[in-house]
A protein has these predicted regions:
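Interdomain helical linkers/hinges and coiled-coil/dimerization scaffolds
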Residues: 92-95, 99-146
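Receiver (REC) domain active-site loop signature in two-component systems and cognate sites
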Residues: 58
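Active-site residues of response regulator receiver
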Residues: 8, 55
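Short amphipathic alpha-helix used as the core "switch/output" element in two-component signaling
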Residues: 42, 64-75
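Two-component/phosphorelay signaling modules centered on CheY-like receiver
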Residues: 11-32, 46
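Alpha4 helix (beta4-alpha4-beta5 surface) of REC/receiver domains from two-component response regulators
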Residues: 41, 65, 86-101
Length: 146
């Protein structure tokens, strides 16, 4: 069972993600929510999620900085990015930091579920089955400003 943390500054969207998705059918359980990257880092310490679903543009700390800090701390949780940014540069930066998927908002019915299903299939092919948590991801060398 994947433990999910939902990170989104807009409360209606965050609650919609938590309530509208049939997480149990996906083999997941939502263990926490956060309204910005800083709250997310604290929630990661508290809940040890194996999957983080996050927005990019948030106050206090954005999703890319949160992801960068997670990786610097050795946290290899899977990350799915949800954002209104349609910039290839943002997608590329998130993927370089180990994000496993990138969905543009507004996303359509079933898109998030499909992203989670793709992740679970990748995990099954890798022999993880979703029960052991994420395997370490190979990470590129990052320079300031990346």
């Amino acid at each position: 069972m994947l433990k999910v943390l939902v990170v989104e500054d807009e409360e209606m969207i965050r609650k919609g993600i938590v309530l509208a998705v049939d997480w149990a059918a996906l083999g997941c359980v939502v263990v926490g929510e956060a309204a910005n990257g800083l709250q997310a880092l604290e929630a990661v310490e508290r809940y040890a999620p194996s999957l983080i679903i996050t927005d990019l543009k948030m106050p206090v700390m954005d999703g890319l900085e949160m992801l960068r800090q997670l990786r610097e701390r050795g946290n290899n949780a899977f990350v799915i990015i949800l954002t209104a940014y349609d910039s290839f540069a943002y997608a590329q930066a998130a993927l370089r930091l180990g994000a496993v998927d990138f969905l543009l908002k507004p996303f359509h019915d079933g898109e998030l579920e499909q992203a989670v299903t793709r992740l679970k299939q990748r995990m099954d092919r890798a022999g993880q089955g979703g029960e052991k948590g994420p395997a370490p991801l190979p990470l590129p060398e990052l320079k300031k400003g990346d």
